[in-house]
Amino acid sequence: MGQKVHPIGIRLGVVKKHNANWYADPKQYSEYLLNDLQVRDYLRKKLDNAMISHIMIERPTGAAKITISTARPGIVIGKKGEDIEKLQKELTKMMGVPAQVNIEEITSPDLDARLVAEGIASQLERRVMFRRAMKRAVQNSMRSGAQGIKVELSGRLGGAEIARTEWYREGRVPLHTLRADIDYASVRAETTYGTIGVKVWVFRGEILDGMDSVYNPPKEDKTRAPKRRGRSNSNRRNSDRANTDRG
């Protein structure tokens, strides 16, 4: 069953959180949901070169908060924050409430399934050999600390007349284990021969303490341990030597 269901959907509430956090009346639910889809499509088209992974949308009372996870925060922010201010004004018009945009930097893009899939898709569109693109992405992810990764391509691979599916995997990807931190993404590559589907699974380890340990990690205690009073080992050795000399 774990191989058929969406890897992120089955882990919601266990080790994964929703990409939207808001409550609405039954009459407004469909309106908010459609607005979320429009906002996500708008941001991905406008910031297509910013390497965006996730877009978190929150709706507190009378406002909206949008958190963009990107590997290139400088492109989103712009010079002196000019681009992000324009973005906030446009999103305010779209959502009908004051919108606040926050940027979250992705420090390890090779461990993000969305960014890995988009990288493979861009290589396929530039006519790079599909096996080379798959192996390069897998090697980079394993080198960055992934415990397992699987890449699957479907379509007219290499310009073949008959479409087929090929996949490549390294490490382990336990789809049935709910505590496994597995990131998943599917992207389409528009090539001259047609559309090629790219699917990526990245296994980043197991989460034993639940999703709170991922989204709210405990702060490190920087207080120093109190120093012990008393003589050090060197002083004890010197005193022992003095006693033996006296004896």
Swiss-Prot record:
Entries under PROSITE patterns matching the protein: KH_TYPE_2, RIBOSOMAL_S3
Domain KH type-2 stretches: 39-107
UniProt entry tagged with the keyword Ion transport: no
Comp. bias intervals (Basic and acidic residues): 237-247
Ranges where the record places region Disordered: 213-247
Entry keywords, A to Z: Ribonucleoprotein, Ribosomal protein, RNA-binding, rRNA-binding
GO biological process: translation
Keyword Amino-acid biosynthesis belongs to the record: no
Annotated signal sequence range: none
Alphabetized GO MF terms: mRNA binding; rRNA binding; structural constituent of ribosome
SMART domains in UniProt: KH (SM00322)
Gene3D superfamilies: 3.30.300.20, Ribosomal protein S3, C-terminal domain (3.30.1140.32)
Family of the protein in this entry: Belongs to the universal ribosomal protein uS3 family.
PANTHER family registered for this protein in UniProt: 30S/40S RIBOSOMAL PROTEIN S3, SMALL RIBOSOMAL SUBUNIT PROTEIN US3C
HAMAP family tied to this protein: Ribosomal_uS3_B (MF_01309_B)
Subunit architecture: Part of the 30S ribosomal subunit. Forms a tight complex with proteins S10 and S14.
Protein purpose: Binds the lower part of the 30S subunit head. Binds mRNA in the 70S ribosome, positioning it for translation.
Stated name of the protein: Small ribosomal subunit protein uS3
